[in-house]
Amino acid sequence: MGDTRVTVIGGGLAGTEAAWQLARAGVAVELVEMKPERRSPAHVLPGLAELVCSNSLRSDNPLNAVGLLHEELRRLGSLVLGCADETRVPAGDALAVDRERFSEAVTARLTGHAGVRIVHRELEELPPPPALAVIATGPLTADALAARLAETTGGRLHFYDAIAPIVAAESIDRSIAYARSRYGKGSGDDYLNLPLDEAQYHAFVEALLQGEKVAAHGFEEPRYFEGCLPIEVMAERGLEVLAHGPLKPVGLEDPRTGRRPHAVVQLRREDVDGTAWNLVGFQTRLTWPEQRRIFRAFLPGLANAEFVRLGQIHRNTFVDAPRVLAPDLSVRAAPHLFLAGQITGVEGYVESAACGLMAARAVLDRLAGRAFRPPPPATALGALHRHLTGEAHPPGYDYQPSNVVFALFPPLTGRHRGKAGRKEAHVERARKELAPWIDSAPPTAVPAAPAAG
């Protein structure tokens, strides 16, 4: 494969991981990074793989879905995990890094690899066929390239995350929540409903108004689409605005009383098996501690809520992956282009790196004339792939970015003792499925990354 050059656009976690995996497999790579010619407002370091927000790659415990993803990436020779392990700082069971040393380590690995050529310039056009390219430009993709991508994908490009919190099903108090679709439509159990009387509703609105908000970054303009306003912004427009908006009770009478509550919080099934539920319309800029406090204290039925994901809104460029991408992460309308990282709708540093690894393996399969072999669905990598293809979500799901969570995994079979038992079963099954997948694909399975010299 050495005479074939693949272009990778973007030097973040997804792009550097994709470039590394391709180069280690013998493919010549041109890695295009716009720094220092142009910087997004979020970037300050000179090197590749800059961690913009947190320095944490989250839990390293495999009983956590992201920790299991760490383990799988290490087994596949991940550049990002290798450099993170070398530059880690004490953080309990989390994998946190010295972000400057981490960026330097990734940059050194790639600049030191004979198969990688790094070009510092901004691209305003997508590479033409037939040469293959991986687009990994991240959540702050430059405007010109974003416009070309929107044209290529038929306009299916989103510019803001509208992420609502997700609650574990087992932590919802079913003595308070009731199953009902508005006006009785659907199967009847598509939604759970949390009823609020007038006093409860007013107390909740007041808590929203007083709650601590995340300060907008300088590169995030505080302007919102009317279709995805933060709940606290709606609350600022008037006391009853939410009760006439996402919390409207019309058609949601409580079957136990036969009466319509003053307001209703709807929870929508997040996965096919109903293990996680999305708080409908609850995109928010409340800080994560405030979300936990306010939603548990003021929403009936969520006093003991376990949050699988917390809400947020921020600038993000991502495609509607299940409709735009083929299973091998290539663009359906332009098969020579592969997407990787947050632009596909994965959320998080580690998930971005994992997506870069999957895209690289897909490119290798394409170059070898093989059909793409996706990771086994019960692995953490496979769960992310299920998210990207839509297999992890019910029909009609409104595609939004997601971290890797156990709710994306296929359901377990048999009985398992409590939450810990279910997590252990997920991990055991994932490990069993990953090993034969690696063994069956030696041309695309790479050796572990060498230590930095």
From Swiss-Prot:
<dbReference type="GO" id="GO:0002098">
    <property type="term" value="P:tRNA wobble uridine modification"/>
</dbReference>
<dbReference type="GO" id="GO:0030488">
    <property type="term" value="P:tRNA methylation"/>
</dbReference>
<keyword id="KW-0819">tRNA processing</keyword>
<dbReference type="Pfam" id="PF01134">
    <property type="entry name" value="GIDA"/>
</dbReference>
<dbReference type="InterPro" id="IPR004417">
    <property type="entry name" value="TrmFO"/>
</dbReference>
<protein>
    <recommendedName>
        <fullName>Methylenetetrahydrofolate--tRNA-(uracil-5-)-methyltransferase TrmFO</fullName>
        <ecNumber>2.1.1.74</ecNumber>
    </recommendedName>
</protein>
<dbReference type="InterPro" id="IPR040131">
    <property type="entry name" value="MnmG_N"/>
</dbReference>
<keyword id="KW-0963">Cytoplasm</keyword>
<comment type="function">
    <text>Catalyzes the folate-dependent formation of 5-methyl-uridine at position 54 (M-5-U54) in all tRNAs.</text>
</comment>
<dbReference type="GO" id="GO:0047151">
    <property type="term" value="F:tRNA (uracil(54)-C5)-methyltransferase activity, 5,10-methylenetetrahydrofolate-dependent"/>
</dbReference>
<dbReference type="GO" id="GO:0050660">
    <property type="term" value="F:flavin adenine dinucleotide binding"/>
</dbReference>
<feature type="binding site">
    <location>
        <begin position="10"/>
        <end position="15"/>
    </location>
    <ligand>
        <name>FAD</name>
    </ligand>
</feature>
<keyword id="KW-0520">NAD</keyword>
<dbReference type="GO" id="GO:0005829">
    <property type="term" value="C:cytosol"/>
</dbReference>
<dbReference type="InterPro" id="IPR002218">
    <property type="entry name" value="MnmG-rel"/>
</dbReference>
<keyword id="KW-0274">FAD</keyword>
<feature type="compositionally biased region" description="Low complexity">
    <location>
        <begin position="441"/>
        <end position="453"/>
    </location>
</feature>
<keyword id="KW-0521">NADP</keyword>
<keyword id="KW-0285">Flavoprotein</keyword>
<keyword id="KW-0808">Transferase</keyword>
<comment type="similarity">
    <text>Belongs to the MnmG family. TrmFO subfamily.</text>
</comment>
<feature type="region of interest" description="Disordered">
    <location>
        <begin position="433"/>
        <end position="453"/>
    </location>
</feature>
<dbReference type="InterPro" id="IPR036188">
    <property type="entry name" value="FAD/NAD-bd_sf"/>
</dbReference>
<keyword id="KW-0489">Methyltransferase</keyword>
